[in-house]
Structures are given as structure tokens and as C-alpha cells.
Amino acid sequence: MNIENSGVAVERPGRRVRRRTDGDVATCVRVLADVHRRDGYPVNWPDRPDAWLSQSCAWGAWVAELGGRVVGHVGLSRGGEGDLAPGVWSDRNGTNKDLTAVVSRLFVAPQARGHGIGALLIGRAVAEARGRGLHPVLDVVESDTAAAALYERLGWELMATVEQRWSPSQLVAVHCYAAAS
């Protein structure tokens, strides 16, 4: 991974991040399916993965390209009903949770890992959040140790681990992270 002294991944020839277009969604769904088969993300495969990708991206969605191919995705939005990190951040800081932006729907194709793509995507979402005057936060299931390791390498702080009921029979431990101030 190419990281500048500031700890921020930078674009290099052959890899870049750009705004997602409607034409990218089908490719993103295929990449997400590969990620799901390999890593189990998302934990519960959505009935409509195209809609799932878009529902948490109200403020923007970006794709990463490696060698001209879409290999990753990230979204940014205001916290929703199932997002725990905004409330945890708000409680810790004594501020309104509306001052947060949720980084979500982050994934990188298995064959594209090790090139700094995840860091580039997170960096783009963080820049957008900060440009809006908001603090970036995210939730990740406790079992996704690779994602947690990435966030921590990038300086994100684990605020809490909480139990979240996803269905009457599914209770999941979720880590709540906040970007460094």
C-alpha cells in the first residue's frame, strides 16, 4: 500500500477513486458477490443488492479502479435506524449525532487487496464528510477482523462494541468506530 507520511493513501498510476455512476452498479454487485462468497460480507445477502448498495449512500458513493476495472466501493450518508456509531459518538462527545456521517458499504475485490484500495476509498469518504463539517463514523461486525484492522491502521478509534438485534433470532456484536479528530 502506498501511504504518504501523513498516513493517507494516495492515488497512483493505475489506481484511482471516482464517483460511482449508475453504470457502475451492476459491476459493484458482481464484486460484492465475490466479497460475500469469500468473506461473508454482507452477513445477510440482500434480496436486491443494487438497492442495498444505494440505500446508505445519500451523500455520495465512490468506486475504486485498479487497472481501469472497478474493484471497490464506499458510501457516505447520515446515520440511519440501524447505525449505532452516530449515537455512540454523540454520547461520548456530548454533541448531536447529526454532526456525524456514516461511512458504509465498503468493500474491495479479493484479487485487488494489498494495493491500498480500501484506504483510498475510506480517505475519499472521510474527505467528503469533513468537507460537510461532519465527523466520520462507522459500524462493523465484530467478526470482520480484517476490516477492523484496516480501520485501526488508518487511525480510527474503537469507541465501543455493542450487541445489535438484526432479527428475532440474530443478535450480532458490532464495533463502533470514529475517525481520528
Per-region residue spans from a language model:
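Terminal substrate-recognition subdomain of acyl/acetyltransferases
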Residues: 2-10, 138, 157, 162-181
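A short beta-loop-alpha structural element at the N-terminal edge
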Residues: 14-30
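Active-site rim helix/loop that mediates acceptor-substrate recognition in acyltransferases
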Residues: 37-70, 75
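Conserved acetyl-CoA-binding loop-helix of GNAT-fold acetyltransferases
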Residues: 108, 114-127, 149-153
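Conserved active-site alpha-helix within GNAT-family acetyltransferase domains
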Residues: 119, 131, 143-160, 167-170
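Conserved GNAT acetyl-CoA-binding A-motif
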Residues: 129-141
